[in-house]
Each structure stands twice: as C-alpha cells, then as structure tokens.
Regions:
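Class II aminoacyl-tRNA synthetase catalytic cores and aaRS-like
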Residues: 2-687
Length: 687
C-alpha cells in the first residue's frame, strides 16, 4: 500500500503491520529509509490505519493555542500597491499587511532585516525589526521573526518608514521590489509555519506529486494562471457585451451518445444505469437553439477518454458558442473579433481584421497537415510526372505513387547540412519516417560543387526542373517522399510530419531561428465523412463511414447534397477550423437544423441501427419543433492560452493537469474502486 512518494510500503509484512497498530498513535514512526523525492529532505513517514498522516506528535494544547491565535489575525489595512505608490502621506502610519516571510538578514542581535512577499508573491517590501514587546504583551515580535522559516504566512502590524531609494545601478533591481519605504515591525502574527523538511529555492525542481509547490515556487506558472483568468474575462466581455451572447451552463451529467470519441461513464446506484460526462456541450447548445436562445456561450468543461499528448487532457476547457439564424461566415467573423481583442489586450499584438481561408485539400497538398504552421515555408510540390521511374523504386515499394518534394534551407554550407542530416537520421525522431511502410524519404543536399548540384539521381532534366521549381541554393535540403495515389484523409501526411520534425530539429541544433509571430488561417471544406477507423469508436454505423467531426455537421452546398447518398466520401462539410502556428485553436460548423435531414444522415448514410438512433431521439425531436438554422464553434481554451504564452504543453497553463497516463499525481487519482463501491454501483471486474 503506497501512502505517498515519501511513505513506506507496509504490505510486505503483516507482522510488522500488527505490531505498529498495537502501538499508541504517537509511536507509529517508521525508522526505515523513506523513498527519495526531489525538493525534500529525507524524513520518517508516519503510518495511520485511517490513511491520515500526522506531521507532528507535539503538545495538543499548544497546537490548539497556535491555531486559535491564527483565527484572530488582524485584517490588512494597506496593500503592497499602496506601499509602492510613492505616497508621502503613508510615512509613519501604522498599518497591517499580510504576506509570506522571505529571506532574513540578522545585522546584529538587536537588528534584523527581512523580506515580506505579498499574497500573490509578486511584490516585496523590507521589514525592519528591533527588540520590543508585542502590542498584546506577548513575546517579542523580534524573536518571533527571527525564528520563523522562510515562506511562512504572517500578518505584520508595523509602521511605514521612508527609505532612501538606492542609486541607479547600485540597488536591487528585482521586479516588484518596493524601495521607497520599509515597514518597522511592531507586532507579528504567525499564521502557519513552513516545515524544515521542504527545501524551496529558486532552482528547486518539484515533482508533479508536489504541484502546490511547483506553482508556489514558479512565477511562470502563477503568471500563466493569472493570464488565463484575464483571457476568460475578455472572452466573456467580448461575446456577452459586444455580441449579445447569453452565458448558459449545461449539465455535466449527460448520456452516452456515439459522437466520435470515447466517453467517461458515471455509474448510478440503479442497476445498469449510468451517466456519461459530455465530450462537449454540442447537443445541449443545439437544443438551446431550438429553445429560442439566439446566442449561447459557455466556458465549458469537457471530457474525452482518449490517448494523451502534449495538447490533450482527459478533461479540458473550451469556449463553446452557438448562433441561431447564422452562417459559417457569421461565426468566423465573431471568433475573429474575440481573437483580435485577446491578442491586442493581452499581448499588444496586432491581428489582421480577417484571417485567410484555405481548403483542407490545399492545406494537405501544400503543407501535409490540416493545421499547417504557415511561418515555416517549405511548401510541398508534386513531382511524380518528372521523377525517373528508377528513382521512385528506390524510395519505396509503391507502384505508380504520388511523389512529393520540398526544400528546407538548413545552411549555406552543404557540409553543415550533411552533418545535420546525419544527426537527425540517427535520432529517435527519425524512426517513424525510416520505418514508413510506403518508403523512406529520399534526402538530397544541393551542392554546386557536385555533379548536377548533388541531384544527379534525378537525371539532367528533372534536376534542372527541381532546382528551378524550388529555387535551390547551396546547402538546401531536398526531401522526396512517395505516398499512395489516394484521396487525403486524416490530419497529416508523412512528408508533412517530416517537414515539422526537420524544422524542429534544425531550430534545436541552431541551424534555423525559431519562428516568431502568429500566423492565423481558417481551414475549411473538410470531407464530411471519412472511412471508419478501428482505433476510434466513431458513430457505430454499419456503412464503413464515420462523420469526420460529428454527425450534426451540414453538407456545404447544394452540389454536396446531391452526392450525399451516391458518393458520401466526396461530400464537403460546412466545417471550419481556426489554426495558428500549426495548432488547431478550435473548430466549428453549420449544423443540420432539419429533423428529416439529420435522420437521413444517421440512418441512410452512416447506417446507424435503430438502437443507436434512439440515443439521438431527444435531438431529433428538438429539430422537428421548428429549430432555426444555426452554426457554432468551440475554441480549446487550454490550447489557446498555451499558444498565446508560447508554451509547448497545455499542462503549463492548467492549475492541476493530468499526467501522460491521465493521473493527478498530487491527489493520486484515479483510485481503485473498493468492494463496497463496486457493490453500491452494481459493478464487477472481468478477469
């Protein structure tokens, strides 16, 4: 039984367990060496059968008195902002301020200087202490301050004194340091103590199990959470005040419906019945459109039981909106206004009035991705018509494939480019491309000192065409890749993934500068349906098809409608994704607002069974009751904040993220169900 990362497992010895339980609580201390954790000194762990660990076995009366005193601490009468205001009227005033004790310097037995950090840990003022009696006759505040450990929370009763600011270039230039005044300590109320077994320094690295200390010790995490709060406020103000949206909360206990992703089920005490946590508020917001709500918005919690990556969490937050009597253009213009305001107010960055549009087909053709990073350049071109047949056979086993080429300008020195290629191909990042069943990439380096500039395998004519097409210069990396001659499906192609991997490696090794700025684009004209994927649940129809996004998306045009039954894979969706710097910030669509049409798509195109159709009866009924045309979108809020702050992982902008295995390492969730819980919810584990 693991109590924590510092506790000792007692499961191996029932005899030891029995002896421990027979001892008084204060004696149940293990002298065995505890497990190692970063950021802590070793200390014994205390076992309690109820699962509670005691950190002290001191005098109970003393503990009660300490806590009683902390209940009576004085209210703050002055803020750090007021202290920093250069207001001379504050001098010699008695104030109460709250904060955390910082570094202390004992100048002598009778003179101590200490830092006091404000509640947000963003500002610091100097405390000055000399021996006195407390205002209530208690022990000397001077002694209390000298005994308190750094990071302990306190209430300071003191007098503001003017302080001569240090000369330019000679003083402490730390951000938030108040230099115009200091506070002479008259009394101090210790509100808690910071334990001596936790070592907190600027360079201390705390593990996820100590997320509270990560946040406390890392101002970038605290700043990200504050930034996130401001962004949420701006989103609400822009949509509700400027665009007349109504913020509405939708239920978290929903029902299981086959929308495309795996769900989390919540069992009930009624045998066989369970709720499902919503993948998104999609159906509820469409129901609101049929309820006479013209514009809905919610900063919503959503849940998906899917594979985790840097930009995925099992629970996540999205800015969810829907508009009645609206088209895709209406939604996109509204979202552009929100994005402009966010970037303007939080980053002082000018975003274009409107964002460019690019079809799914164009994005996949030019960049090998449906969320292209336009800042990288390196557009992909088709060249199978000019590449010799023997070269095609050398780069893969495919017969009559599509062959694509791109260039990446690594270095002006061809030898440096060769060195980079060797390093990359030997790295783990290259393995997916080396093991591609459709063939490895052909990699060439343009070098004017070589025959045909290093492109001799292309033959004279093709080498000349490729040089002119790509505008090649010495040191440019030329990549050739074959793929099956099929329509695009999914989110990327091998050469598109290689484009990103090579750029990332080139930046890492100093050959290219990291891309800067923000490049926004809308990706539209997605296929409405895709072939079923065994790794995803889809909608459970029998047609071998799945809705590419969800089954409520409308075909784009009348021409697409004509193909719905005869050529469903050729139908374009009225769907649009907002992409910036290779990240999909969000996606939306115009919805099917007709009950007959919605039923046709589910029953006739996807071939859902009658049982599956019953899962959507509520929505069909809402659409039948005169639901107006409507469209909407959801912005991934965690992802949006990460992109704005330049973070690689959404975990850096979430207070308590899950690990790559979906675990909360601090609170140790998820937990194993007990036999009692299993019995309550009528569950059994299959062997």
């Amino acid at each position: 039984m693991t109590l924590s990362s510092r506790a000792i497992s007692l499961a191996a010895s029932s005899a030891l367990r029995s002896r421990l339980l027979s001892l008084p609580p204060a004696c149940r201390i293990l002298s065995l060496e505890p497990a190692f954790t970063r950021g802590r000194r070793s200390r014994p762990a205390i076992y309690q059968p109820e699962g509670i660990r005691l950190y002290s076995s001191g005098n109970t009366s003393e503990a009660l008195q300490k806590f009683k005193k902390s209940l009576q601490f004085p209210s703050a009468t002055c803020s750090f902002e007021q202290l920093a205001s250069q207001n001379q009227d504050l001098n010699d005033q008695r104030v109460v301020i709250h904060g955390y004790v910082g570094a202390r310097r004992d100048a002598s037995k009778n003179l101590t200087f200490a830092e006091l950090h404000d509640m947000s840990l963003g500002s610091t003022v100097q405390l000055v202490s000399t021996p006195t009696k407390g205002v209530d006759g208690s022990d000397s505040p001077h002694n209390v301050l000298r005994e308190l450990r750094e990071h302990s929370p306190v209430a300071i009763n003191g007098t503001i004194k003017a302080r001569k600011a240090p000369s330019a270039g000679k003083g402490d230039s730390r951000p938030g340091l108040i230099t115009n005044v200091e506070v002479k300590v008259d009394d101090i109320t210790a509100l808690n103590t910071f334990p001596d077994d936790i070592i907190m320094a600027k360079d201390t690295v705390f593990p996820p199990e100590q997320r509270h200390l990560q946040i406390r010790n890392d101002d970038s995490l605290r700043n990200a959470l504050a930034f996130r709060s401001k962004a949420a406020r701006i989103v609400r103000n822009e949509l509700c005040d400027e665009h007349s949206f109504t913020e509405i909360e939708t239920p978290l206990l929903f029902k299981s419906t086959p929308e495309g992703a795996r769900e989390f089920l919540v069992p009930t005490r009624v045998p066989g019945l369970a709720y499902a946590l919503p993948q998104s508020p999609q159906q509820y917001k469409q129901i609101l459109m049929g309820s006479g709500i013209p514009r809905y918005v919610q900063i919503a919690k959503c849940f998906r039981d899917e594979d985790l990556r840097a930009d995925r969490q099992p629970e996540f937050t999205q800015v969810d909106l829907e508009m009645a009597f609206a088209s895709a253009e209406d939604v996109m213009r509204t979202v552009e206004a929100v994005v402009r305001r966010l970037w303007s107010e939080l980053l002082a960055y000018d975003v274009p009035e409107t964002f460019p549009r690019m079809s799914y087909e164009e994005a996949m053709s030019k960049y090998g991705s449906d969320k292209p990073d336009l800042r990288l350049g390196s557009e992909i071109r088709r060249v199978e018509y000019m590449v010799p047949v023997d070269l095609v056979s050398k780069i893969g086993p495919l017969t009559d494939p599509i062959v694509e080429v791109m260039k990446i300008p690594i270095s002006e020195d061809a030898n440096e480019t060769r060195k980079f290629v060797g390093t990359f191909m030997d790295s783990p990042e290259a393995q997916p491309f080396i093991q591609n069943p459709h063939g490895q990439p052909g990699i060439f380096i343009f070098d004017s000192r070589k025959p045909l500039q290093g492109l001799q395998v292309f033959g004279f004519e093709a080498a000349e065409q490729v040089e002119e097409m790509l505008e090649l210069e010495d040191g440019d990396l030329v990549v050739l890749q074959a793929r099956p001659k099929e329509d695009f499906s999914g989110g990327s192609t091998p050469i598109g993934n290689l484009r990103l991997a090579l750029h990332k490696a080139a930046v890492k090794h100093g050959y290219l500068r990291a891309p800067e700025g923000f490049a926004f684009t809308w990706i539209n004209d997605f296929p409405l349906f895709s072939p079923s994927n065994d790794s995803e649940p889809g909608q459970g129809g029998a047609a071998g098809l799945a809705a590419t996004h969800h089954p409520f998306t409308s075909p784009k045009t009348a021409e697409d409608m004509d193909l719905l039954l005869s050529e469903p894979l050729s139908v374009r969706a009225d769907h649009y994704d907002l992409v910036v710097n290779g990240v999909e910030l969000g996606g939306g669509s115009r919805r099917i607002h007709s009950a007959e049409m919605q039923e046709l798509v589910m029953r006739e195109v996807l071939k859902m069974s009658d049982e599956r159709m019953k899962d959507f009866e509520h929505l069909i009924e809402v659409l039948r009751a005169g639901c107006p045309p409507h469209a909407g979108l959801a912005l991934g809020f965690d992802r949006l904040i990460a992109v704005m702050l330049g973070k690689e992982s959404v975990r850096d902008v979430i207070a308590f993220p899950k690990s790559g295995k979906g675990e909360d390492m601090l609170v140790k969730s998820p937990t194993k169900m007990t036999d009692g819980q299993m019995e309550t919810y009528h569950l059994k584990l299959r062997a």
